[in-house]
UniProtKB/Swiss-Prot annotation:
This is Small ribosomal subunit protein uS12. Disulfide bonds: none annotated. With S4 and S5 plays an important role in translational accuracy. Interacts with and stabilizes bases of the 16S rRNA that are involved in tRNA selection in the A site and with the mRNA backbone. Located at the interface of the 30S and 50S subunits, it traverses the body of the 30S subunit contacting proteins on the other side and probably holding the rRNA structure together. The combined cluster of proteins S8, S12 and S17 appears to hold together the shoulder and platform of the 30S subunit. Keywords: Methylation, Ribonucleoprotein, Ribosomal protein, RNA-binding, rRNA-binding, tRNA-binding. The gene is rpsL. It comes from the Bacteria. It comes from Shewanella sp. (strain W3-18-1). The modification 3-methylthioaspartic acid is found at residue 89. One of its GO terms (molecular function) is tRNA binding.
C-alpha cells in the first residue's frame, strides 16, 4: 500500500482501455473511399469467398471492411460508411460496411432483418 506522501508525489495512473476499432477514433461510423474491392477466403474450418473492401478513411487510416449481404455494387472509388464489428473467420477484418448508406446500395431481395442491410419495406 502506498503512503499518502507517495501518492501526492506520484498519483495512481488510470487504467487505459484498449479499443478493438482504433480507426474509428471513438466515432460510431467513419466515411471512406474504397481503394480495392476483392474476395478472400476464411480461416479453417470455414470455406467461402468473402467480399471485402480496402478503405482509406477520412482520418487517414487504411482499413479492411467486410461487405455483408448477398450482392453489392461497390467498386474502386466508391464512398462508403464503415462501422465497427469484426468478422471472426477473416483475420484482420475489424470493420463492417454500412449497407444502404452513401454509395453502398442496400440488399434488394431482403425480407427479414432489413434494417441491418439498408433494405426498404417491400410493398405487400
Amino acid at each position: 500500500m502506498a503512503t499518502v506522501n507517495q501518492l501526492v508525489r506520484k498519483p495512481r495512473a488510470p487504467k487505459v482501455d484498449k479499443t478493438n476499432v482504433p480507426a474509428l477514433n471513438a466515432c460510431p461510423q467513419k466515411r471512406g473511399v474504397c481503394t480495392r474491392v476483392y474476395t478472400t477466403t476464411p480461416k479453417k474450418p470455414n470455406s467461402a469467398l468473402r467480399k471485402v473492401a480496402r478503405v482509406r478513411l477520412t482520418n487517414g487510416f487504411e482499413v479492411t471492411s467486410y461487405i455483408g449481404g448477398e450482392g453489392h455494387n461497390l467498386q474502386e472509388h466508391s464512398v462508403i460508411l464503415i462501422r465497427g464489428g469484426r468478422v471472426k473467420d477473416l483475420p484482420g477484418v475489424r470493420y463492417h460496411t454500412v449497407r444502404g448508406a452513401l454509395d453502398c446500395a442496400g440488399v434488394s431481395s431482403r425480407r427479414q432483418g432489413r434494417s441491418k442491410y439498408g433494405a426498404k419495406r417491400p410493398k405487400s
